[in-house]
Swiss-Prot record:
InterPro entries on file: BRCT_dom, BRCT_dom_sf, DisA/LigA_HHH, DNA_ligase, DNA_ligase_AS, DNA_ligase_CS, DNAligase_adenylation, DNAligase_N
Protein name: DNA ligase
Gene Ontology cellular component annotations, sorted alphabetically: cytosol
Chain's gene name: ligA
Function: DNA ligase that catalyzes the formation of phosphodiester linkages between 5'-phosphoryl and 3'-hydroxyl groups in double-stranded DNA using NAD as a coenzyme and as the energy source for the reaction. It is essential for DNA replication and repair of damaged DNA.
Enzyme Commission number(s) of this protein: 6.5.1.2
Domain of life: Bacteria
Amino acid sequence: MDPKLEQRARELRALLQKASIAYYVHDAPILEDSVYDRLYRELQELERAYPELITPDSPTQRVGEKPAEQFPTVSHRIPLYSLENAFNLEELKEWQERLWRVLGRTPEEGELEYVCELKIDGAALALTYVDGLLQRGATRGDGQSGEDITPNIRAIPSIPLRLATAAPPPVLEVRGEAYLPIAEFERINRERCSAGDPPFANPRNCAAGTLRQLDSRVVAARKLSFFAYALHWPEGWPSGDPPQTQWECLQRLKDLGLPVNPLSQVCRGLEEVVQFYERWRQAQLPYACDGVVVKLNSLRLQEEAGFTQKFPRWAIALKYPAQEVPTRIRAIVASVGRTGAVTPVAELEPVLLAGTTVSRASLHNADRLEELDVHIGDTAIVRKAGEIIPEVVGILKELRPPDAVPYRLPSHCPECGTLLVRPAGEAITRCPNPACPAKIRGQLQHWASRDAMDIEGLGEKRVAQLVEKLGVRTVADLYRLTPEHLESLEGMGSRSSQKLVQAIQRSRQQPWERVLYGLGIPHVGVVTAQILAQHFPAPELLAQARAEDIAQIYGIGAEIAEAVVAWFADPAHQKLLQELRELGIPALPRQAAPAVSQVLAGKKFVITGTLPTLSRQQAKAWIESRGGKVTASVSRQTDYVVVGSDPGSKLKQAQALGIPLLSEAELLALDPK
């Protein structure tokens, strides 16, 4: 190989990477488009003639020629949490008050410093760089795991294949948002309409769908963009001091060649946060934006504030006001859910709302019906609750037609005819019949859902057939179905029947936490199921637990604990669990024991400062796995305060109350094993 050719290839790669960073990160192009294209073609021709010159970070290697067959599921080394939402300034103030309490601070100690970032309406991504090279890109998924879509990530031109540094961290985890510029979204929809295809509903849906394309050439053609907003260095920072604030993180991301939204700003106190929010609320931006993300600037205070089951306590999304539209109520139906809750649902004249077509909206309950005085034929004001679920929020009574009909919930279940009940103190009307077909359908659909047993092909229509035609009554019945049973159903042939039975049988291997979530215990969501499964690694152990023991687990509480105990005490549920265990579900030994001793059972800990070797989350997990509970604030009920370097005001509070202090080493010594 001619050394001059190798040198030229290196020069071209370096120049093209520098030009990309100047264009996408600094918005300051250093090359005309025609010059960039000429240099790109020169590198392409060199690599075509001498394939040994091709490197993984070459700009010519962004788009592969061969479509992927599927996207494997991968675990996130660092979870991607959701954000708590605030829909008005009062909720924002309440969040800050909670933050003050968690940090053990008062307003008199000075305003907190925040970083405000525009909340781009796109798809969250997790990027992993190893020794400076892009190794993996994945979707957010459920926050714990997502799909490995690396070929598609490489096709997004603003995401660098190599970090712009000679001394990268050994591993760098980057979080950001892939989005579709509005102009590009409109271009794609024009082309789809011209081709006779239905247009995409909104840029977010288009971006998410594009990222899951099996052919990365489609991704490249749609010209997605990307903004990075977080970074983590799990194996250390290479040289100098690591970032100490969120603002420094954004600057480091930019220095590494990753695009960062230039409209972010440091704000001192909520007054400046509100000014930032108002400044951009009505702005015409080149991308969809649905609010402002407010984050504590100090990384040390972020770590001290910690996380709830779902959200970081140190960040919140201040959402823009929800879009509201009027439309006519054509009918109202009573919908029965898997718990027996009866919800009035308005069937509407279809209307476009927040980028999607809405034809049904919730009326919540009987109290809401009475409060709104809803009539069939009314013109209703509809909005999306939390930007997700359409709901009726008002009635334009001045537009009520003479033939409008008042609506009241039925006295008997529309599915099974059982007299409905409304427990004292509850707003929800319920069907008490455990054999109600609607409840059975809901339970089966929940069991088969993606976050539970993830049974592909077992959707709403198929579940209805199983209940109506084959007499399926419990989730255990699913595992007794054969292809011959299914072939009797409309639309099911030999091949599709075998495929569904295989999907059902595969789900036997799902872990205990998914089974637990799939059981549909009240108040037990995905995260709660994971926590319970960690502490009680078999159904028998959880079934034997007392409510007070369950309530001691960090992140659970009395209401969830009582619901769990009540569920396991029901004879019908005990029978179902026995049937599942006989079927080998969940797939674990019949006798399981806790992995570690419970030497810290009943003890309450508070952590303050930075520990020498353990992160705050690692220390919390260590304590909880041994039966202890980690709380956010110091009180007289606190047993120990674990103190690291640079502690906060919690140290003074502990000293004032005479609470024992522990170093990290003293903490670990509490369990000699």
